[in-house]
Amino acid sequence: MKFAFYTLGCKTNQYETQAMEQLLLTQGHTVGRWEEACDGYIINTCSVTAVADKKNRAVIRRCRKQNPDAVIAVCGCYSQHAPEAMDALGVDVVGGSAQRQAFVDMLLECANTRQKQQQLDNALRRREFEVLPAGGLSERTRAMLKVQDGCVNFCSYCIIPYTRGPVRSAPLELAVEQAKALAERGYREIVLTGIEIASWGVDLPGKPALTALVSAICRAVPQCRVRLGSLEPRIITEDFCRELAAFANLCPQFHLSMQSGCDTVLARMKRKYDTARYYESVALLNRFFPGCAITTDMIVAFPGETPEEFQQSLAFIRKCGFADMHIFPYSRRPGTPADQMPNQLGNEVKESRSRAAIAVAEEMSRAFREALVGTVQEVLFEEQEGGYFAGHAPNYVKVYAQGDELHNQIRSVEITSVHLDGVSGRILP
């Protein structure tokens, strides 16, 4: 049978989609594109905000309307959090944010019998890391490797600890073996991902540090680039940077969670750092990885955020000089403390502050990309786009160049100009 996937949300979801693709492929099924006619469609959902939930529902409704006779299966954080919504949306197979093998089994059972299936667990009771096959479709150049799941930070705006459960870490030996398998299959880059990879190891014997895992993987696959998923400021220390700076195949791009550049807002968010500690992390990364790309997320118009607090955030992001940012207006999430906070801000304020923050972010992004002009970057090429081949440099800047079939090749490119959402250059002989 033929199936197609639609993935919303984080890189962990991308990994889990790749794992489910692999489970289907090993059983003799095929994985098609979303727009193709298939026997079943799997939607891997995100529930990080109420806006994400709205997008989930829109994708499910559109899929059901366009494919009235196909099996529609939904998994991920949205179905984990709101399983009661699935029946009204016409979903045939309902899974949560774990038990992917069982979910695939239910999908195949429904495809054969047309009997609806549902299986959910209590996320807060999870204690074991779910081992899944690493991989997916062979035409990809970059593979996700989940090394951790769960979160216990309980930030005031976030529901993910309730949908993903407590921290569970992949044993180091398992992660290394999966990384080797991905390298042997031809992937040129491996992204270490999880819900909060900074917590990797806290539940393992001896509580090993994340650096032990990253170092072991970098040594095991020297032919692959290794990229880190989102990090927390607390983990960026001098020892962390010194140890990882020794690996040439570690990509110098660090997504450092921020959310706000104002200490009083960070306190209301229940984040576990202040701007001084955050900037210390930025300075350490710049010191040990010269020219690295530091990227982040920012929530604007959090409940009670005053104009002065917002201006503090803008000044702070300018100080940090981020290479790229994701800007989100605060979205109320029922069931979280922030949803009950006073002084909820209106859409007009959210929109104006989003525009202001995006303008600063775009200015910084352009400055970072302009600084690359004249440099030579090792680019992993992925696909053709508008007459160019596009790929990513180690710092994750998108690079466009003209050339013949370059898929999954790493080539030296001299950067000549800023172009679209990245830079362009010429491939060196």
What are the residue ranges of the model-derived segments?
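Proteins enriched for Cys/Gly/acidic motifs involved in redox and nucleic-acid/cofactor modification
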Residues: 1-200, 215, 239, 244, ...
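Residues at or immediately flanking beta-strands
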Residues: 2, 71, 189, 225-227, ...
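Short, solvent-exposed loop/turn segments at secondary-structure boundaries
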Residues: 52-54, 166-171, 201-207, 268-271, ...
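Conserved strand-turn element in the central/C-terminal portion of the radical SAM core barrel
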Residues: 154, 158-165, 226-234, 260-270, ...
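Conserved, mostly hydrophobic/aromatic
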Residues: 175, 192, 228, 256, ...
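Acidic, glycine-rich loop-and-beta core segments that form the ion-binding/anion-interacting portion
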Residues: 209-261, 272-279
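Contiguous mid-protein beta-loop-alpha structural module that forms a pocket-lining wall or clamp
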Residues: 305, 321-322
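Terminal RNA-binding accessory module
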Residues: 340-429
